[in-house]
A protein has these predicted regions:
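Extended, structured polyanion-binding interfaces
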Residues: 1-667
Length: 667
């Protein structure tokens, strides 16, 4: 056995206090909610994960530091799970080709029929595998297994095998969040180590440095977390801007759907082991919710229950509530009219005699609270009031206001409305329609869970909704207190629950959308961003990299009829050749043979007005078709302008105060 070094050191008992009332300025308050359930979670402090200080007390009383990626870490940290001391994840696990894996065997397993091995293979130190059917040699795989692949493999359910990890209840949850932190540490370590070598700078500055003295040590800056890193600020900002691209092209979304996991789904109960409850198996709830979410999207997109869908997007969240839920935005080809709302969305208790199944689902999943006088300890209560504005007013008809929040029909009992008796804190409470959350009868009946469906009425609410859907990972403001409850300082960290850890270990998507949004670069001439290191700086300076903007200026005749943001509809961006290529599939464009159109959208990166020349360049790209060069963009009616701002003024793209000056001179 072993001892953790911390056990040998006298220390006060500490506890972590999470404060939901302390939200950093500029951050979405929902990211900092207090946990509403008892769950296992980890709080990651800081933007970048650092190596943990893991110290063991050896038998000879020496202290030894162990990395979380050491092959023995899992067995040392979780001896109850890995009592045989089996190896955990480490960097040198080789990946076997998934196609040929069933046919591979080490040579010594079949000595009576040796494979044909060349002299070169014999001289090498590589272990040789052979195909059992052809007896032809196959060299040892060189690709390594990632931490995410390894732990996803360990959590799998296999027929005929007993995976004892799945039986460890809360220790299982702790193992999951611990291993997810290890996965994130590996990814961030890779980015951090590569960024020490990789630098970025505008091309013109790199070229000047190379031409001057060839020293690039003082040129450029370290790169930051890329937008491809899920959950990074850049990633969430791009998704929010992508949602606004849908709004610019197709107007407001029609429906805002919140789909929540139901732990009592039959698929979850069926997969539980003996004496287990859904609380013990967050891995199953993650898998089932993923499949149910897929079914819901198919229900909306393929079966077109509300009409043909033009575009959609969703984000999966937890918000410290335990079970996952998805926020979905749906744009329809034919917009929902106000007189159609009542046929799609209801905020009333259904008639039990007409539809007993729907009545059971609504009364079980779609009643808010009740809170207020019935339960002041409800999570929705803030300063003595319900933050969700319940109970709502009773209305005979649905009203679509101008603030973006429609008021749904909620009839009173005297006006053919209904009520139901529910238990709240041991007391019977008569609940009427004013406590019902808006729902779609067909979705509630099919999926038997909490599905809140809202009609998006006004453009005023769209910006908030788009930011809400893409607000980012859960966060927590917390403090560590000692035995005397003394708080030294508050800290902010990322909050990862065991439910989220399983979801991410299984590589399930956090965000999905359709159609794709292609990001289009905008920069001044020779101002494109260049990524380089010391070994390739000269080559990068000699050959400036192509961007979507420079490639747009070099495309064919049909592209010269398009605006910059419209190019992705008819062209795909080839990342390897750095060029636009015509689409080979899609809807044929009339009058243009071999030209096809798709539903892809283009989004030109935003530019701050303080960067004035680049800002005016972007304004020209939004309005001017088919520029063949930066020089032509500054040419208006044959006149070459000195600046892009001057070109914008000649094209009347800017407001001018000169007419006010002229009027002020008139007596």
């Amino acid at each position: 056995m072993f001892k953790i070094a911390l056990d040998l050191m006298p220390s006060d008992s500490h506890k972590i206090i999470i404060r939901a009332d302390k939200t950093p300025a500029g951050k979405h308050t929902r990211r900092f909610n207090s946990p509403t359930i008892d769950e296992v979670a980890v709080i990651i402090v800081g933007e970048n994960l650092q190596s943990r200080d893991i110290v063991l007390h050896r038998r000879n009383s020496d202290l030894k530091r162990v990395s979380e990626t050491h092959r023995s870490y899992d067995a040392l940290q979780y001896p109850l799970i890995f009592w045989q001391g089996e190896d955990g994840y480490h960097f040198n696990i080789k990946m076997v080709n998934e196609v040929t894996a069933p046919l591979l065997a080490v040579f010594v397993l079949a000595p009576e029929s040796p494979p044909r091995i060349s002299e070169e293979m014999t001289r090498s130190n590589d272990l040789v595998f052979c195909n059992l059917h052809t007896r032809s040699p196959v060299l040892k795989p060189t690709k390594k297994v990632s931490a995410m692949n390894f732990y996803s493999y360990r959590l799998m359910i296999r027929q005929g095998e007993v995976n004892h990890i799945l039986m460890c209840q809360r220790l299982f949850h702790q193992f999951a969040v611990d291993m997810y932190v290890k996965i994130e540490t590996e990814r961030l370590t890779y980015i951090r180590l590569n960024q020490r070598q990789l630098r970025s700078e505008e091309y013109i500055h790199l070229r000047d440095a190379i031409n001057a003295d060839g020293n690039v040590n003082n040129v450029g800056r370290m790169t930051i977390l890329p937008a491809t890193y899920i959950g990074s600020p850049c990633h969430m900002h791009e998704y929010a801007q992508g949602a606004m691209s849908y709004v610019r092209h197709y107007g407001r979304p029609d429906l805002f759907v919140t789909f929540t996991c139901n732990p009592k789904w039959s698929e979850i109960k069926r997969e539980l082991l003996h004496s287990q409850t859904p609380v013990d198996r967050h891995d199953i709830t993650a898998r089932v919710f993923k499949q149910r979410l897929k079914s819901l999207m198919n229900f909306l997109l393929k079966h077109c229950v509300y009409g043909r869908v033009r575009c959609w997007m969703y984000s999966v969240e937890w918000q410290k509530r335990g079970l996952p839920h998805a926020h979905i935005l749906v744009w329809l080809v034919h917009k929902i009219r106000p007189d159609q709302i009542d046929s799609i969305i209801s905020a009333e208790i259904p008639d039990e005699t007409v539809d007993p199944k729907l009545h059971a689902v609504v009364t079980k999943h779609m009643i808010h609270g009740p809170c207020g006088l019935f339960n002041y300890n409800s999570p929705c209560m803030v300063d003595g009031k319900c933050s969700k504005r319940y109970p709502r007013d009773l209305l005979a008809e649905t009203i679509t206001g101008n603030d973006g929040h429609p008021l749904y029909r909620r009839r009173s009992v005297a006006d053919n409305g209904r009520s139901v008796v529910v238990k709240v804190r041991g007391q019977n409470v008569d609940v009427a329609n004013r406590w019902i959350m808006p729902y779609s009868p067909i979705l509630s009946k099919v999926f038997e869970t909490h599905i809140n469906v809202e009609y998006c009425n006004s453009v005023k609410s769209i910006k908030y909704i788009c930011k809400y859907v893409n607000k980012g990972s859960d966060m927590a403001v917390f403090a560590v207190t000692n035995a005397n409850d003394e708080i030294s300082q508050y800290q902010m960290g990322r909050y990862v629950s065991s439910n989220e850890a399983f979801w991410r270990i299984f590589s399930f998507a956090i965000h999905e959308r359709h159609p794709t949004v292609v990001h289009l670069a905008v920069h001044l001439e020779n101002g494109q961003r260049v990524y380089f290191n010391e070994s390739n700086a000269a080559d990068r300076a000699a050959r400036p990299p192509s961007t979507t903007l420079t490639s747009f200026c070099q495309t064919d005749d049909f592209a010269r009829t398009l605006l910059y943001a419209d190019v992705p509809r008819n062209y795909t961006w080839n990342a390897s050749s750095k060029s636009f290529q015509r689409r080979k599939q899609g809807t044929p464009v009339e009058g243009h043979p071999n030209v096809f159109s798709s539903d892809a959208l283009g989004r030109i990166y935003t530019v701050h007005p303080n960067n004035d020349e680049c800002y005016y360049l972007r304004l020209l790209l939004v309005n001017v078709r088919a520029p063949i060069s930066f020089k032509q963009l500054r040419t208006v009616n044959g006149q070459l302008c000195a600046t892009y701002r001057e070109a914008c003024q000649l094209l009347h793209l800017l407001e001018n105060d000169s007419h006010w000056m002229i009027r002020s001179r008139i007596p």
